């Protein structure tokens, strides 16, 4: 019997063939084990391949054991080619296998994969691969350790091995734990407050559920980009923080210095600010500048050292970390939605008027803290598919988590969400089927089109003209999800379109193509503003997946900034649209203003600095006001309709329009 530390030592070490063979012998007790690993032909991309033996499980499934040494590309970033090797496991000399446990060892690094490959038999079945990524750089690896301990306890069967590699179980476990933390965070006794209107003491828990979901979204994004070494671990290390924060009490319920000093400065003054522009806010008359550091009094180190603490983090842009506080200089009313403020004034009961309060214990409590929860799970920036899944929390699976949290914020589904343990989402295979069928239908449901989507597609040089025509048709599509929720459909559309484009044009760049598709082809609408933010979060993580590793010698550490998606994903009621007979919003006399508005939003998509975004948003507002004047001069538009259009601001992440117009809000006429 192996204990947890023995398993952890095995999984956290670099791969050793003899050590692995010993593990197979002790853990699985295979009935057929080669005395020496039997060399097998290595496919393209591998230096060596070995067949180690096979076993018959308690439920009569035959499972083979294989090892490949991977020579081309990092095993931690390369999966599609590995899955294509599985058909080679069917060899008359060994007999047929129902499944295989395969090690892919990267000879150029310490990383290695352990994959459970199912559905090998039969030419019509597309093999499924479920994978753990192991090695010294992969952290504590709590998930595989606990899963293999359970496998050892219940006994080795096909069903129990598949359970040990189950992504669905992982997601459900994570959601249940996160939901318990969410309920704790929103409980009034926990004491979390966000000021909202600073003049009203009674509203500082208004929409507290959405505020906590937004906090979770921002933190989970940070957790993902930690996988790319873009944020230092020291910002989440309790012991190191004791030397940074003044009077830091991590278990305290009456102190929120960590959220204010570390997380708010990370979100709003670091990830949302260019590296060269980072500084502390000092001018008392410029409280509206929400990209400057605050709370120097909460640190035990000087301001220069604080800037150095955050100095290795790139500027990401994108709006996810834009402070949502609204000031009277630009609006009729001031609202502290995020509560990022130097003003420490309090009401008579001690609650902040302008500043958010989140207790330290919510993050660091030994039993219930969020960081302990997150550290118990493995995260991956790789995007899973129905046929190829790493057993870790990936961006798509987190969509399921957020879909359930969003269901809790809806009064109609709140009680069901509390009891459901995570069922308010469309399963991935169904989403993928819907997306594929929609694209095939739009592109022309022919045998050639379907072949491009088939798992066994192979590029045919004689069809180059057809591929070019298909590429042109694909890039001309405008696709809208009118109730995008947490973004499952837009994410699947992005993945399918990218995969098809890569198949028919292997020369395209994945990162640039994703940006182009997001800018020109994919749109989303949802009545909940927080749902729109989650959709954008998932698209951002998808973009991060394709970034090159950081390069400290280059500006912004070699990391491109994220686009602004405010005019691509909007919060509105898609059920309320103009009457078909009135869809003349962009008639000839409005064309010039319309084109100017579209150009401003195109520029805003790529805008990087706070000043540039403000300039474009002010310009956008003027153009919208001009269009309203022109609309009032045209027949066919009611006063109510014009009023709704006039008050819609695409850059207000807290607001949802009671009206939806794809022409007005997205600048597009033809959608699928």
Segments predicted by a language model, with ranges:
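Preference for the N-terminal adenyl/adenosyl cofactor-binding alpha/beta module
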Residues: 2-60, 70-91, 97-494, 498, ...
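Short, basic, glycine/proline-bearing loop/turn elements
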Residues: 62-73, 639-648
């Amino acid at each position: 019997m192996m204990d947890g530390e023995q398993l952890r030592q095995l999984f956290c070490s670099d791969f050793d063939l003899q050590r692995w063979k010993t593990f197979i012998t002790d853990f699985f007790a295979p009935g057929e084990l080669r005395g020496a690993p039997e060399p097998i032909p290595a496919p393209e991309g591998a230096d060596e391949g070995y067949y180690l033996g096979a076993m018959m499980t308690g439920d009569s499934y035959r499972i083979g054991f294989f090892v490949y040494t991977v020579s081309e590309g990092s095993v931690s970033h390369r999966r599609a080619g590995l899955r294509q090797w599985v058909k080679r496991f069917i060899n008359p000399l060994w007999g047929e296998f129902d499944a295989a446990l395969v090690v892919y060892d990267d000879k150029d690094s310490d990383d290695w994969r352990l994959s459970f490959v199912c559905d090998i038999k039969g030419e019509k079945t597309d093999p499924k691969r479920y994978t753990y990524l192991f090695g010294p750089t992969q952290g504590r690896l709590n998930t595989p350790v606990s899963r293999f301990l359970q496998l050892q306890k219940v006994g080795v069967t096909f069903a129990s091995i598949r359970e040990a590699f189950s992504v669905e179980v992982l997601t459900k476990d994570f959601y249940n734990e996160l939901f318990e933390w969410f309920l704790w965070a929103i409980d009034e006794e926990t004491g979390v407050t966000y000021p909202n209107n600073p003049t009203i003491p009674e509203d500082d828990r208004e929409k507290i559920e959405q505020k906590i979901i937004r906090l979770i979204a921002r933190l989970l994004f940070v957790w993902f980009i930690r996988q790319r070494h873009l944020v230092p671990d020291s910002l989440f290390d309790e012991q190191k923080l004791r030397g940074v924060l003044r009077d830091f009490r991590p278990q305290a319920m009456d102190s929120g210095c960590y959220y204010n000093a570390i997380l708010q400065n990370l979100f709003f003054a670091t990830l949302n600010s260019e590296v060269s522009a980072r500084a502390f806010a000092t001018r008392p008359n410029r409280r509206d500048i929400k990209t400057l550091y605050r709370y120097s009094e909460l640190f035990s180190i000087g301001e220069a050292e604080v800037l150095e603490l955050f100095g290795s983090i790139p500027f990401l842009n994108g709006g996810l970390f834009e402070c949502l506080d609204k000031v009277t200089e630009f609006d009729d009313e001031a609202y502290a939605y995020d509560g990022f403020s130097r003003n420490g004034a309090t009401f008579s009961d001690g609650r902040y008027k302008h500043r958010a309060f989140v207790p330290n214990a919510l993050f660091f409590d030994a039993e219930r803290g969020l960081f302990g929860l997150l550290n118990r799970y493995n995260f991956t920036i790789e995007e899973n598919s129905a046929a190829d899944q790493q057993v870790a929390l990936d961006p798509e699976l987190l969509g399921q988590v957020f879909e359930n949290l969003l269901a809790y914020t809806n009064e109609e589904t709140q009680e069901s969400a509390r009891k459901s343990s995570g069922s308010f989402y469309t399963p991935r295979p169904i989403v993928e089927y819907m997306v594929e069928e929609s694209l095939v239908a739009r592109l022309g449901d022919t045998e050639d089109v379907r072949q491009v989507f088939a798992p066994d597609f192979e590029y045919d040089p004689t069809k180059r003209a057809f591929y070019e025509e298909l590429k042109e048709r694909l890039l001309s599509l405008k696709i809208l999800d009118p109730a995008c929720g947490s973004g499952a459909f837009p994410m699947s559309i992005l993945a399918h379109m990218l995969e098809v484009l890569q198949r028919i044009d292997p020369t395209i760049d994945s990162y640039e193509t994703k940006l182009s598709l997001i800018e020109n082809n994919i749109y989303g609408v949802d009545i909940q503003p927080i749902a729109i933010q989650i959709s954008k979060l998932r698209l951002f993580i998808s973009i991060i997946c394709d970034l090159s590793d950081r390069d400290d010698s280059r500006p912004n550490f070699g990391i491109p900034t994220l686009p602004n998606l405010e005019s691509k994903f909007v919060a509105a009621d898609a059920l309320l649209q103009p009457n078909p007979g009135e869809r003349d919003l962009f008639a000839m006399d409005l064309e010039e203003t319309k084109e100017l508005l579209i150009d401003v939003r195109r520029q805003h998509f790529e805008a990087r600095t706070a000043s540039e975004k403000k300039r474009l948003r002010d310009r956008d507002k003027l153009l919208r006001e001009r269009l309203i004047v022109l609309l009032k001069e045209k027949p066919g538009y009611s006063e109510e309709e014009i009023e709704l259009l006039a008050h819609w601001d695409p850059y207000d992440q807290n607001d949802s329009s009671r009206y939806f117009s794809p022409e007005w809000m997205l600048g597009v006429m033809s959608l699928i």
